[in-house]
Each structure stands twice: as C-alpha cells, then as structure tokens.
C-alpha cells in the first residue's frame, strides 16, 4: 500500500512540474503558446497514455487500483481544461471546443500586419518624385516588366517577400514555365481560368496578380516565411497603377 501511495506522489509531483513548465512557457511567450496549444495538448495526453501503458507493463494490470488511476486521469484532464484550454472553451460535455483566444490572436496579428502594410505603401508613394512622371518610355514588354519589377522590389523587400513580374502572354504560351521554375508552384486549371478573367489567385503562400495597365503581366508575390495579406494584393496592384504614371 505504501508503494502505491509513493507512486501516486511521484505521479502528482511530475504533474506539478509539467504544470509549472506550462505556466512558465505561457508567461514567457503568450503568442507562441497560443500557436502551439494544440501540439501541447497532444503531447500532454500522449505522455499520459505512454506513462499508464508503461506502468501496466511493469506492474501488471491491477483493477483494485482503479480509484488511484481515476484520480490520476482526473488530474491530467483538470490541467488540460483548467489551464491549457481556459478561457477558450465554448462547450465541454459536447466535446466541442472553440479556440477563441487563438482566433483573436490571429485577427490581432492580421490587423497589425495590415496597418504596417498600409504604412509601407504610403511611404513608397511619398518617396516617389513627381518630376519623374511622364518621362519613361518602354519599347518592349521586357523593358516594361523589368522597370515595374524594380519599382515593386522596394515593397517586396519591406514585407520580406519576393516579387517577380512576368509577361502574361509568354507564361500562358509556355504553361507558366517561368513561374513554375522560379517558385516551384503548380497552378491548377481553375486558377488559370481566374487569371484569364483578370482575377488574382493564391497558391499556398504565393500570390499571382494579373495586371493589364500598360502591358499584360502577371505579378507573382512569394511571402516566404511571412503570410501574405489581402492588403498585399491591393497594394501591389495600386503600385502598378502608380508606376504607369512614369510612362510618356
């Protein structure tokens, strides 16, 4: 009996240690904690299942200890509900959970990113010298795409993205060979139809914006490690319009 009590104490001690680690992790980086919450829960219950399995393998199955096992299980669930999920639970007994906190954090990050994108766009426009308007002339589509690409690079650098401008006709005639080779992206048929209708598409974290302002082009944005925002599509298209003012 004393051995059983000792094992229970050890189990509760381990639970307390894990709980303190979770608290430390939460206060150290709340945003990262919210992002990794589901992974933490899976790890938490995975450790519980493994520990119970190992215990049975070593000690054998003893149904007389069901009260102790029930208490241990209740403690594991309590830590999950009281700390990992709270206050993001909308329904417990129906096994339906609404991770409100994660959603709020996601919206908050999107709003902050959108505001930052707006400030970047405004800064680029303000730094353009109006005296340059109406002074440029592009004799070929290649010259135009290079000029537009150089203008859009400043926006791409500031948001940590890669922007490349392609001639639309050339890409359509080669089954998007240029885009596929540079971005390792396969464009589904339905997206090609949308591009033909002058509608922007997004394949994973790569956005493609059709623009027919001076010349028919596809503007490709690779967000890399940063998620693309809807504001990015709007800003890049508006910058393309702004770039057209340079034309004679």
Swiss-Prot record:
GO biological process: sporulation resulting in formation of a cellular spore
Keywords, in A-Z order: Cell membrane, Membrane, Sporulation, Toxin-antitoxin system, Transmembrane, Transmembrane helix
Pfam families: SpoIISA_toxin
InterPro entries given in the database record: SpoIISA_toxin
Signal sequence interval, chain numbering: none
Transmembrane regions: 5-25, 46-66, 69-89
Entry membrane topology: Multi-pass membrane protein
GO cellular component, one term: plasma membrane
Localization in the cell: Cell membrane
Function comment: Toxic component of a type II toxin-antitoxin (TA) system. Upon expression in E.coli growth ceases.
Family according to the record: Belongs to the SpoIISA toxin family.
Record text on subunit structure and interactions: Probably forms a complex with SpoIISB in which SpoIISB neutralizes the toxic activity.
Official protein name in the record: Stage II sporulation protein SA
Organism: Bacillus anthracis
Protein encoded by which gene: spoIISA
